Amino acid sequence: MGVDLTGISKKSRVIRHHTYSTNPYIKLLIKLYKFLAKRTSSGFNKVVYQRLIKSRSNRAPISLSRIAVVMKRKAVFTAKSKAAPIAVVVGDVLDDVRMARIPAMRVCALRFSKSARQSIVAAGGECLTFDQLAMIAPTGKNTYLLRGRKSGRESVRHFGASGVPGSHSKPYATNRGKETKRGRRTGRSYKRKAFRHV
């Protein structure tokens, strides 16, 4: 008799070799960066190609404040400097209204929100697309690859068992009023019997 091999299917890693996106712009970028990854020896193009293939939930957005904090550590910015390093985000860049002043930054992303684009341009920065980046830095020189937190989604808060001690996962049913009110709990003056139709 053979032995049942349980859990074998869980061990296999799912690796994407193509995109499921119907966006023609992303499909063209995948072609471009696949070509650059083959023709150049830089690992930058390979990483960008792999991230372009990923699903939207794995291409998490990032806020301007996070980019500003990271880029401030990396380099000192001068207004409208073309030699400043480029922050590369394979995803969306969103505005942060809590940040009154942002430094002049050069940012390349798949998409910018309207207010994020206005903030970058107003600060003397530059918003780049990936085809422009391929012309400026075909090997990824003078660039910093950044990405947003994947755990920032609201649905991630529900992952795990919410009733287990020490677990901070959010329950799906937050309003438990009728189940735990007076007359239902033991030791609260009386216990109401369940109503039955005869």
From Swiss-Prot:
| InterPro entries xrefs | Ribosomal_eL18 (IPR000039), Ribosomal_uL15/eL18 (IPR021131), Ribosomal_uL15/eL18_sf (IPR036227)
Primary location: cytoplasm
Instruction: For the region Disordered, give the residue spans.
Output: 157-198
According to its UniProt entry, this protein's organism is: Leishmania major
Query: Which family, according to the similarity comment?
Result: Belongs to the eukaryotic ribosomal protein eL18 family.
Question: Which Pfam families does the annotation name?
Answer: Ribosomal_L18
- Please name the GO terms that the record assigns under molecular function: RNA binding; structural constituent of ribosome
Which branch of life, at top level? Eukaryota
A GO CC annotation given for this chain: cytosolic large ribosomal subunit
SUPFAM superfamilies in alphabetical order: Ribosomal proteins L15p and L18e
Kindly list the places in or outside the cell where this protein is found, as annotated in its UniProt entry.
Cytoplasm
- Asked whether the keyword Zinc is assigned, the reply is no
- The protein depicted here goes by the name Large ribosomal subunit protein eL18
Name the gene for this chain: RPL18-A
State the Gene Ontology BP annotations: translation
Q: Where is the composition biased (Basic residues)?
A: 179-198
Keywords from UniProt, A to Z, are:
Cytoplasm, Ribonucleoprotein, Ribosomal protein
Q: Does the keyword Ribonucleoprotein apply?
A: yes
